[in-house]
Swiss-Prot record:
Catalyzes the reversible formation of acyl-phosphate (acyl-PO(4)) from acyl-[acyl-carrier-protein] (acyl-ACP). This enzyme utilizes acyl-ACP as fatty acyl donor, but not acyl-CoA. InterPro entries: FA_synthesis (IPR003664), Phospholipid_synth_PlsX-like (IPR012281). Homodimer. Probably interacts with PlsY. Belongs to the PlsX family. Gene3D superfamilies: Isopropylmalate Dehydrogenase. The lineage of its organism: Bacteria, Pseudomonadati, Pseudomonadota, Gammaproteobacteria, Vibrionales. It is found in: Cytoplasm. Its main location: cytoplasm. This is Phosphate acyltransferase. Its EC number is 2.3.1.274. Signal peptide: none annotated. Pathway: Lipid metabolism; phospholipid metabolism. It catalyses: a fatty acyl-[ACP] + phosphate = an acyl phosphate + holo-[ACP]. The keyword Lipid metabolism applies.
Length: 341
C-alpha cells in the first residue's frame, strides 16, 4: 500500500486537540505513508500544532467543525443531530472514500450508532462488535469481544463475533486462532442456553478452531487467541481488569516513591517487574475496533493520553493495511455457505 488516510475526530475525549493533535503527529512520524485528516475547531487544532516543532504538517489536513457530540448525548439524539459534528464528518470521510479509517475518543454510544448509520454492516453481520487486544502471560495477545456494543446477543450473533475475531487474530497472531467462549465454568454442562447453543454452532464449524469454554480467571492466561462474550459481560470484564491493573501499578509506584532508596533498589532488583507492569498498562492496548462494518472505525478511551491515542491510530493503520473488512466479509460468506449445506 503506497499511502493511507485516517480521519480523526479531533474534539472527542476528555482532552480533545490537546492530546489528539500531538498523537497525530506522533503517528505520522511512525508511519511515513500515513496522512491525517483532523476534524474539529480549526483554531484549537492549529494552536496545538504551533506548539510542536515537526515537519510532517504537509500530511495533515484540517477540516473545521465547531459542533461536538457531548458525552451525555443519547445515541438516538446523536443520530438526529449529528450533521456538521466532528465525529459525523470524520465518519462521512470514510463513507465517501476520502479516508480509509476513522478514530474517535468521543461518545461510545453515538460513535457506534453513527458508524452503523453511515458505513452500514457487512453482509452476514447482524450487529457490529467492539474488540480489543488484552495482554497475556506470554508474548502474544488475546482478542476479546464484544466489549459493549451489544449488551444482549443471540447465539448467531456470538457465532459471527467468533468469525470476525478469528479473522482479526489471523492477521496479527496465527493462521489458526484458538477461539473460546467466556463462561462460568469449563465443563460442557455449565452456562446458560445462549452460551451452550453458540458452543454447539462453533463445534460444528470446520473454519473455526473452537477450544471450548474459558473462565474469567483465565482471560489473561494466553490459552485462547479469541475470547467471545456478549457486550455486557465483556465490558464489565475489561473495566474490572483495567481497574485492578491500575490499582496494582499505582500501589507499586506509591510504595517506592516514599523513599529514594526504595526507588533505586526497585529499578535494580525489579527490572523485569517494571517490564511486566508496563505490559499491564491499559494504554498499551488502547483502540477498540468496531468490527462488522463496511469501513474501519477505532474507538479510543476518552481519557487516553498522547501515546495511548497514537496506539489507537496505529490499530487503524494496521487494519487498513490488512484489509480487515474485506477479509471478514469473505470469511463470513464462506462460513454461512457451509452452514446452509
Amino acid at each position: 500500500m503506497t499511502g493511507l488516510t485516517v480521519a480523526l475526530d479531533a474534539m472527542g475525549g476528555d482532552f480533545g486537540p490537546q492530546v489528539i493533535v500531538p498523537a497525530a503527529v506522533q503517528a505520522l512520524l511512525q508511519y511515513p505513508e500515513l496522512k491525517i485528516k483532523l476534524y474539529g475547531d480549526h483554531s484549537a487544532i492549529t494552536a496545538q500544532l504551533s506548539l510542536l516543532n515537526q515537519h510532517s504538517y504537509s500530511r495533515i489536513s484540517i477540516i473545521h467543525s465547531d459542533l461536538v457530540i457531548a458525552d451525555e448525548t443519547r445515541p438516538s439524539h446523536a443520530l438526529r443531530r449529528s450533521q456538521g459534528t466532528s465525529m459525523r464528518m470524520a465518519l462521512d470521510a470514510v463513507s465517501d472514500g476520502e479516508a480509509d479509517a476513522c478514530v474517535s475518543a468521543g461518545n461510545t454510544g453515538a460513535l457506534m450508532a453513527l458508524s452503523r448509520y453511515t458505513l452500514k454492516q457487512l453482509p452476514g453481520v447482524d450487529r457490529p462488535a467492539l474488540v480489543s487486544a488484552i495482554p497475556t502471560h506470554g508474548l502474544n495477545k488475546t482478542w476479546l469481544l464484544d466489549l459493549g456494543a451489544n449488551v444482549s446477543c443471540d447465539a448467531d450473533t456470538l457465532f459471527q463475533f467468533a468469525v470476525m475475531g478469528s479473522v482479526l487474530a489471523e492477521q496479527s497472531l496465527t493462521s489458526k486462532p484458538r477461539v473460546a467462549l467466556l463462561n462460568i465454568g469449563e465443563e460442557e454442562i455449565k452456562g446458560n442456553d445462549l452460551v451452550k447453543r453458540c458452543a454447539e454452532m462453533l463445534s460444528n464449524s470446520p473454519d473455526i478452531h473452537y477450544i471450548g469454554y474459558i473462565e474469567g480467571d483465565q482471560l489473561y492466561a494466553g490459552k485462547a487467541d479469541v475470547i467471545v462474550c456478549d457486550g455486557f459481560v465483556g465490558n464489565v470484564s475489561l473495566k474490572t481488569s483495567e481497574g485492578v491493573a491500575n490499582l496494582f501499578i499505582n500501589s507499586f509506584k506509591q510504595t517506592i516513591s516514599t523513599n529514594p532508596m526504595k526507588r533505586l533498589l526497585a529499578k535494580w532488583l525489579f527490572r523485569d517487574l517494571f517490564v511486566s507492569l508496563k505490559k499491564l498498562n491499559p494504554d498499551q492496548y488502547n483502540g477498540a475496533s468496531l468490527l462488522g462494518l463496511r469501513g474501519i472505525v477505532v474507538k479510543s478511551h476518552g481519557r487516553a493520553d498522547t501515546a495511548a491515542f497514537a496506539n489507537a491510530i496505529g490499530e487503524a493503520v494496521h487494519e487498513v493495511k490488512r484489509q480487515i473488512p474485506t477479509k471478514i466479509s469473505d470469511r463470513l460468506e464462506e462460513v454461512l455457505l457451509e452452514r446452509h449445506y
